[in-house]
Amino acid sequence: MWIAVDVMSGDYGPEKIIEGAVNAVNQDGANVVLVGKEEEVGEILLKFEYDTSRVRNQHASEIIDMNDSPSIAVRALRDSSVVQATQLVADKTCVGMFSPGNTGATMASALLYLGRIPGVLRPPIAAPIPQENGPPMLLLDAGANVDCKPDYLAQFAVMGEIYSKLIFNISNPKIGILSNGEEDKKGNAVSLKAFEMIKKLPVCFVGNVEGRDLYGGGKDVDVVVCDGFIGNIVLKATEGLSKSIFNVLRESIKQSSLAQTGALLLKPTFGAIKKRLDYAEYGGALLLGVDGICLIGHGSSNALSVQRAVRVVTECAQRQINDRIAADIKKYDI
């Protein structure tokens, strides 16, 4: 079982991405195809020890950067690392792929070369949101579809339930619709219609949830569905708030020698909190509903997040997540 890793598309060059992929090989027994400029990748690989039978170096001469138009770039730059990684999945050389590059380009490449699972209307991005305790909450759509119809949201609920069961090991995930109030009649025309559709599905639907519920502040929920416009704003706001809290805490500690002494005593606790809230722990966000495993990472992905990403892609393939999605979408006739 081979995983394609786009090593050229991150913000800081290929070395950290390659390091994470090699760690996945050494520590998790993964098999990876590193997709990028062959000579440069080969030189970096000389810095590491690993089982050479588990690592392949696939040449790709081009790179799609963050400023390129996704729909144009994936057609014009067919020898780019993200397109070549997608092609490895399309031709069944690899069971899945990971790219920390241009999100739009990764989505466009997956849709163009992998296509959708039969019956899936629109593939959503499923992003894990860290929680105080236990596994993360799953937010979808986190940015793939800015405008959604009610049946899209109903399908998101089904796909999110499957992901939460198979990857986070939640036996009966609680599913909610993100809204401006928890009352059944709150929401807009799309969410109200989606509410009625999801209510009829054989899932554990808890109704509308508010923004505070995403962080354990109210209603208990495991999967939250919304359109990609709202979802992406929520995701970016969450990332920014998490960084801001730690920055404020750091600056406050600097103001007092007593606080600095206390911080030394609490260093292990702060480390544990930061680890729990660190998106690197989850590898990235899965593009659900495409006919192949496609995990999208942050542009600033470090070695740890890449290693975790390879693990998530492997688990999705082993647990046949796409087969489950295809079966349930057909069964529920959404």
From Swiss-Prot:
Homodimer. Probably interacts with PlsY. Catalyzes the reversible formation of acyl-phosphate (acyl-PO(4)) from acyl-[acyl-carrier-protein] (acyl-ACP). This enzyme utilizes acyl-ACP as fatty acyl donor, but not acyl-CoA. NCBIfam families: plsX. Pfam families: FA_synthesis (PF02504). The gene is plsX. This is Phosphate acyltransferase. InterPro entries: FA_synthesis, Phospholipid_synth_PlsX-like. It catalyses: a fatty acyl-[ACP] + phosphate = an acyl phosphate + holo-[ACP]. It comes from Leptospira borgpetersenii serovar Hardjo-bovis (strain L550). Pathway: Lipid metabolism; phospholipid metabolism. It is an enzyme of class 2 (transferase).
